[in-house]
Amino acid sequence: MVGDTLKLLSPLMTRYFFLLFYSTDSSDLNENQHPLDFDEMAFGKVKSGISFLIQTGVGILGNSFLLCFYNLILFTGHKLRPTDLILSQLALANSMVLFFKGIPQTMAAFGLKYLLNDTGCKFVFYYHRVGTRVSLSTICLLNGFQAIKLNPSICRWMEIKIRSPRFIDFCCLLCWAPHVLMNASVLLLVNGPLNSKNSSAKNNYGYCSYKASKRFSSLHAVLYFSPDFMSLGFMVWASGSMVFFLYRHKQQVQHNHSNRLSCRPSQEARATHTIMVLVSSFFVFYSVHSFLTIWTTVVANPGQWIVTNSVLVASCFPARSPFVLIMSDTHISQFCFACRTRKTLFPNLVVMP
């Protein structure tokens, strides 16, 4: 008797749970909408929320580990490699993307709407855009740095400059300055979450929305993505030059049969392989995200699934890149081994030139 009663009440309790968390406004459930359709829609939001939660949580943990690792190297007095500052900046930018986009989107997917007012939404979107663009610029800097280091004939005077810590600091500063200024237009576009007063807003992210005219949206899309496409073009050129140089050097080594010549390029080849994995994954994820973003900007009424997938794809690289670096960096493996065996921090650390 009790079991039959629970079977009858279970669908009602499930529907009540979804109504409790997802019916914060009248737009979630129309009068003519069937309750089963609403249950499917709410279940889809739960799946999106779980995806955002796992991706954001894992990504923040990975990037936080990298930031702590590079800060430990700095504070313990060990010499930093030229790429350590670039990689730490990449981890910081990725953390900004996940923190200012992944966390609010996760909470909105689970039904926690109206978390931010207009001012909060503006700054959340602003810092997310800055983090995304700094991540792009940092990948370009890392790619160009490795290309010049691998093949100094590309730019002789730059090969000397990249060994200077001050020059690396200056390049990292240049990754921030233009994007802090150029993304100020986001403060004019973003509003608070949709409600009965601003239901005409164009794109709804659950916790924030933005509204702009079609002419302004098209102009903003062109100005916004033009530097990005130029950066992607630079990535393709630098990556192509590295692949060509490694292929030519491999042919030379095979022709000379010299172990002496193959020693150093093997280390450079491993570093180049790691950077190529980062660049290729960034290129794929960012290209898909750019296409979806342009679609939501130009199209009059983009579907909510496009907006959701755009945010999910945008967080793929920041969540996955730290683990590529963790698995490929020998310093990190030495650090983990030292912690496991409870030895002194970095007892046998070999500093790369």
UniProtKB/Swiss-Prot annotation:
Changing A269D: In allele VN1R1*3. It comes from the Eukaryota. The keyword Cytoplasm does not apply. Changing S241F: In allele VN1R1*3. Residues 1-56, 106-132, 191-226, 296-303 are extracellular. It is found in: Cell membrane. One of its GO terms (biological process) is response to pheromone. Residues 78-84, 154-169, 248-274, 325-353 are cytoplasmic. Changing I139T: In allele VN1R1*2. Glycans are attached at N117, N198. Expressed in the olfactory mucosa, very low expression in brain, lung and kidney. GO terms for cellular component: plasma membrane. InterPro entries: GPCR_Rhodpsn_7TM, Vmron_rcpt_1. It is a multi-pass membrane protein. The chain crosses the membrane at residues 57-77, 85-105, 133-153, 170-190, 227-247, 275-295, 304-324. GO terms for molecular function: pheromone receptor activity. PANTHER family: VOMERONASAL TYPE-1 RECEPTOR. The chimpanzee and orangutan orthologous proteins do not exist, their genes are pseudogenes. This is Vomeronasal type-1 receptor 1. The lineage of its organism: Eukaryota, Metazoa, Chordata, Craniata, Vertebrata. The gene is VN1R1.
